[in-house]
Amino acid sequence: MFLQKTIRKKTVVQGIGIHSGDPCTLTFRPAPADTGVYFIRTDLPGSPSLKVTARNVQATSHQTTIGGPAFSVATIEHCVSALSALRIDNLFIELDGPEIPIGDGSARVFLEALLAVGIVEQDQPRKYCYITEPIYFSEGEKHAYVVPYHGLRLTVTIDFPNPTIGKQTIDLDINEQSFGRDVANARTFGFMKDVEALKSRGLAKGGSLDNCIVLDGENVVNPEGLRWADEFVRHKCLDALGDLVTLEMPLMGHVVLYKAGHDVMNKLVRKIWDSPTSYRHVELGADISDEVRRYTGWTVPV
């Protein structure tokens, strides 16, 4: 039986907000079994909390923001992508402001902080959203679908007219090792013309070459260049993994994305919820292969 997990003890991440440029502090704290993942705004009266769920997603333009009637938390995807890869089910995430520290624009700072304090099993079984039939979502030239699979697999394709990016695809089985090796260090990216426009509107005050890949035409402005030639699609994989946390339950399925951003990911999660005959909520034993055959009738690839 696979058990739910949380962290062993609290850990703190400090940095600046990408839009405000202000210092901000994030504190990860253990949470009891069957809690889920909650953000807590300690800077507000009563320290209100907000669950990470697609139902609370308020904005999906260039990032994912969750919110309630009186407050919000912006750019959650880099942080929570690490939770998915580490199979952390229950966590309190305290914030002293509306933004999460941007770090270097990747998920590395969050992954390192969580691994440093350790991850512990809890006394309740881990419940999965087990895809049994294909689920599709399309919007113009953007496409997303999920099909049965014996783990979590992401195939992500992006296609930009800028030749430095162009068309890139990553196909990855997601686990702690593959995430740390192939995805966690991939940075967010943007174009110089867009950065200048954002700053003229009082946004992206914390943005710099230290936390974002910046392209000026076909040229990468960052002196150190790229960490991988396909760092762009690796980061989109990171984003998608973070957005899947809003499903509120770990997914077992193969997610295939084409030109799909945060908006499409939010709609895909909602489409899964709206397709109750295409998934089951299950607790998995040690023999994944037998479980897959029992619930889906699909054969696990050898």
UniProtKB/Swiss-Prot annotation:
Its gene name is lpxC
Name the UniProt record assigns to this protein? UDP-3-O-acyl-N-acetylglucosamine deacetylase
Its annotated pathway? Glycolipid biosynthesis; lipid IV(A) biosynthesis; lipid IV(A) from (3R)-3-hydroxytetradecanoyl-[acyl-carrier-protein] and UDP-N-acetyl-alpha-D-glucosamine: step 2/6
Which cysteines form disulfides? none
Origin species = Bdellovibrio bacteriovorus (strain ATCC 15356 / DSM 50701 / NCIMB 9529 / HD100)
Catalytic activity, reaction form: a UDP-3-O-[(3R)-3-hydroxyacyl]-N-acetyl-alpha-D-glucosamine + H2O = a UDP-3-O-[(3R)-3-hydroxyacyl]-alpha-D-glucosamine + acetate
Q: What class of enzyme is it?
A: hydrolase
Active-site residues, as the UniProt record annotates them:
262 (proton donor)
Q: Which UniProt keywords apply?
A: Hydrolase, Lipid A biosynthesis, Lipid biosynthesis, Lipid metabolism, Metal-binding, Zinc
